[in-house]
Amino acid sequence: MKNLIFFFKLFIHRFQQNKIAVYSGYLTYTTLLSLVPLIMVVFSVFTLLPIFEQATAQLKELVYDNFAPSAGDMVQQYLEMFVDNSKKMGIISIIGLVVVAVMLISSIDNALNEIWHNTKKRSVILSFVVYLAVLIFAPIFAGASIAISSYIFSLEMFSQDGLFSFSHHLLKFIPFVLTWLLFALVYLIVPNTQVKFRHAAVGALFAGVFFTLGKQIFIWYITTFPSYQAIYGALATIPIMIVWIHLSWQVVLLGGQFASVLKDMEMIKAGELANPLTEDRE
């Protein structure tokens, strides 16, 4: 019980230190700028890999629903139009879009390193390679996960009359599992410091649960109290998406802080880190 109380106090202390609300606002702004380039890069990877053709549609649905719950169709329509327009640009412009997409990963890197209180910086070249690898391999990982799970559950033994007919209910958890794995990989790889897998996994579970619950609550609020539609009319999708992206980044950063505080507690118990709560009193 004492450990739980100490964890809660340390979590609140770090929340005040880390300026989560400020960083989530900064990441929201960066996301809005890099949204089209990011989606263009992600789905260009799938175009080069026909094996993921079936999984692409499912992944698109997952992406658009998470970017703007309750307005996914409208967001998808506009974003796909913007992406189609970007395909008509020259090579220099496309390189510029890729750089903008990389800037988003860089912003996430800076925010998470601040949460982990890490002052070590990667070299520019290494940073660019890491960011580009995340852009390329994250969609491949997501596509492979969807493709493999779809194949497994299409087997006869998993049919409604098969031996494992109950498994169809497990399909509902695939989006949550993918979200959890994505958060865990971000917390594990992006910070330029050693992060234990169990810390990243627990932090990702915290973020995944609140992200999923938050999305359902957000959808309920938007559909029950449609004040945005009444005020903004056809433009209501824009503020809805901005608010949701901001809330999403707060959840992602809080999950990272959860993992960071777990590491801090281990170091404090081992005598490798001074207790920041007693330091502040002094």
UniProtKB/Swiss-Prot annotation:
The chain crosses the membrane at residues 32-52, 89-109, 124-144, 170-190, 202-222, 234-254. Keywords: Cell inner membrane, Cell membrane, Membrane, Transmembrane, Transmembrane helix. Its main location: membrane. It is found in: Cell inner membrane. HAMAP family: UPF0761. Belongs to the UPF0761 family. This is UPF0761 membrane protein HAPS_1376.
